[in-house]
Amino acid sequence: HLRTRRQRQMCIRDRALRDVEKEIERMESWATTPKPNVPADNLALDASVKDPATFIRTMYNLIYLAFKTDSTRYATYMLQSMNSSKWDNVPIALGLGATHHLLAHNAVKGGVHLERLGKYDKFQADLLAEFIAKLADTPEGEGSMLDSTVVLYGSSNSQTHVNTDYPLMLAGGEKLGLKPGRLIDFGQVAPPLSNIYLTLLNALDVPSQQFSDSN
């Protein structure tokens, strides 16, 4: 039994060493891969929050180029942060007269307050639409880059800081078995957000039975 246990431990050790060797080989291969040549014409790398449209558009263009050159296959971008004095003031830079935090809280009053928040939401949505259109217009295989890319656009908590009824948008992924182009209203059912993440894991060939509190 002792001999069997030692053999098992040696097998585990050898497997772990081989995994480390493979990872080192992968990293060395990536490190020596020539960097792609990409046009920088549409990249305003000196953009700042003082010109939010140019800054956000540049960030989306960087993500697009990273995908196009296969420099990465995963990207996250936090478009807004109310905890950042710079980004919370973006609506003021756009002439909307208040910080994003105040716009969100005052929207419940309706009238001009709701209209201002709507304009800011549209500002962000228009830039997202440009990014999605660029993916859709880029041929890839037998379809477009959007067909094999998942774009998940989220939101913040509600006016009362409640983290339910999040509006979310999922675009692309038709080649991955997803079915975009639908409006789904869950009403009072309130399924956990992790259900979406579980669906995406499986669509992206990461077989999973559970993710967080998914049901």
Model region roles, listed by residue range:
Residues 7, 74, 165:
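Broad gene-expression machinery/nucleic-acid interaction feature
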Residues 1-12:
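Single conserved hydrophobic/aromatic residue that forms the stacking wall/gate
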Residues 68-71, 79-215:
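Feature marks hydrolase-like catalytic cores characterized by long aromatic- and Gly/Pro-rich stretches
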Residues 8, 20-28, 32, 114-124:
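Charged, low-complexity, helix-prone segments enriched in Lys/Glu/Asp/Gln
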Residues 1, 44, 58, 109-112:
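Generic alpha-helix detector with strongest preference for long hydrophobic helices that associate
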Residues 1, 49-56, 114-125:
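Short acidic-aromatic active-site loops that bind/stabilize oxyanions
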Residues 13-89, 100:
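Extended, H/D-rich, highly charged conserved domains that either
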